[in-house]
Amino acid sequence: MDGVTVIDHPLVQHKLTIMRRKETSTGSFRRLLREISTLLCYEVTRDLELTMETIETPLQTMESPILEGKKLVFASILRAGNGLLEGMLDLVPSARVSHIGVYRDHETLQPVEYYFKAPEDVAERLIIVVDPMLATGNSSIAAIDKLKERGAHNIRFLCLLAAPEGIRNFRAAHPDVPVFTASIDSHLNEKGYIMPGLGDAGDRMYGTK
């Protein structure tokens, strides 16, 4: 699909299979989500710009490339997005963090916003929005709408699973935002869940129903 990158690294696919299993425990699911987020982050940040810095090694002075982490924002769609956030911050601890509170009304399947906090200068930063599931796309669309209202324009979206319906809706709303995912699954069921999916990522991560 145009504008969509499927991250098919063997380690990503292996860990995703274990996460899909219904017998995988809450603790294991949480650990695997953190591990897989590190691998996904590696791919979504592959083309980040580096600057040169003069450093001293134990032997001599040299010019060496370094990442400008302060120009990067990880935006987590609460609450499940936080599961991806932790592993990504392990890789880029200097990145800024945004939290966007959006939940899906299970009757209407429409997003309900309840919280938004982001750096004031989002217009000057690369924003990587994270949410494990791109189902209908409504929550992620609403989150990115909010970021764009604040001036953000350099945005990427990272998820673990995506449904074709969600991708179509998302790309129609935000054709300028590339999508990175570990898998494009078959379809949405009548309740708006990704099939075959892995269940509700937030519930499985936190042990709630």
From Swiss-Prot:
Molecular function terms from GO: GTP binding; magnesium ion binding; uracil phosphoribosyltransferase activity
Recorded catalytic activity of this chain's protein: UMP + diphosphate = 5-phospho-alpha-D-ribose 1-diphosphate + uracil
SUPFAM superfamilies recorded: PRTase-like
Source organism, top-level taxon: Bacteria
Residues annotated to bind 5-phospho-alpha-D-ribose 1-diphosphate: R79, R104, D131, P132, M133, L134, A135, T136, G137, N138, S139, D200
Keywords, in A-Z order: Allosteric enzyme, Glycosyltransferase, GTP-binding, Magnesium, Nucleotide-binding, Transferase
UniProt activity-regulation remark: Allosterically activated by GTP.
Pathway: Pyrimidine metabolism; UMP biosynthesis via salvage pathway; UMP from uracil: step 1/1
Cysteine disulfide partners in this protein: none
Free-text cofactor note: Binds 1 Mg(2+) ion per subunit. The magnesium is bound as Mg-PRPP.
Cofactor(s) demanded: Mg(2+)
Gene3D superfamilies: 3.40.50.2020
GO terms under biological process: UMP salvage; uracil salvage
A Pfam family of this chain: UPRTase
E.C. number: 2.4.2.9
CDD domains, alphabetized: PRTases_typeI (cd06223)
Binding site for uracil: I194, G199, D200, A201
Family to which the UniProt record says this protein belongs: Belongs to the UPRTase family.
NCBIfam families assigned to the protein according to its UniProt record, in alphabetical order: PRK00129.1, upp
The protein's name: Uracil phosphoribosyltransferase
UniProt source species: Rhizobium johnstonii (strain DSM 114642 / LMG 32736 / 3841) (Rhizobium leguminosarum bv. viciae)
Record gene name: upp
